[in-house]
């Protein structure tokens, strides 16, 4: 199975700061998908097919990458972006998730 390693595990950003988190796959995958989860809620699909934003996701979010290296970027951190972000692949069975990047707001 394909192992997804997310970095950093925990990070914080000030309002307006650019944020980048990465997801590294142990083998090449065709696409990467990202989910956002806030405490006490179910994960929401956030970015799919590497770079497509799910409905309602602000344009300050973007996704990029290929093969074994992928990233999620927020151009300008906002308070509501504080959450845990998970990458996921389903190019190869079984479907696998990364362990998550927890993003906190620095005030």
From Swiss-Prot:
InterPro entries the UniProt entry points to: Ig-like_dom, Ig-like_dom_sf, Ig-like_fold, Ig_sub, Ig_V-set, IgV_Light_Chain
Framework-1: annotated span: 1-23
SMART domains assigned: IG, IGv
Spans annotated as Framework-4: 97-106
Cellular component GO terms, alphabetical: immunoglobulin complex
Superkingdom of the source species: Eukaryota
Keywords: Adaptive immunity, Disulfide bond, Hybridoma, Immunity, Immunoglobulin
Keyword Transmembrane helix annotated: no
Disulfide bonds: 23-87
Xref: Gene3D superfamilies: Immunoglobulins (2.60.40.10)
Positions of region (Complementarity-determining-3): 88-96
Region of interest (Framework-2), ranges: 34-48
Region described as Framework-3: spans on this chain: 56-87
Region (Complementarity-determining-2): 49-55
Record region (Complementarity-determining-1): 24-33
GO biological process, any: immune response
Keyword Endoplasmic reticulum set for record: no
Function: Anti-2-phenyl oxazolone (PHOX) Antibody.
PANTHER family: IMMUNOGLOBULIN LIGHT CHAIN
Name by which UniProt lists this protein: Ig kappa chain V-VI region NQ2-48.2.2
Annotated organism of origin: Mus musculus (Mouse)
Lineage: Eukaryota, Metazoa, Chordata, Craniata, Vertebrata
């Amino acid at each position: 199975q394909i192992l997804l390693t997310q970095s950093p595990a925990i990070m914080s950003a000030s309002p307006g700061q650019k944020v980048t988190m990465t997801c590294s796959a142990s083998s090449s995958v065709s696409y990467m998908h990202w989910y956002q989860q806030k405490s006490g809620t179910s994960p929401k699909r956030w970015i799919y097919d590497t770079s497509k934003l799910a409905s309602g996701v602000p344009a300050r979010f973007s996704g990029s990458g290929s093969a074994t290296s992928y990233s999620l970027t927020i151009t300008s951190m906002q308070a509501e972006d504080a959450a845990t972000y998970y990458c996921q692949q389903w190019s190869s069975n079984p479907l696998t998730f990364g362990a998550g990047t927890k993003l906190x707001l620095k005030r």
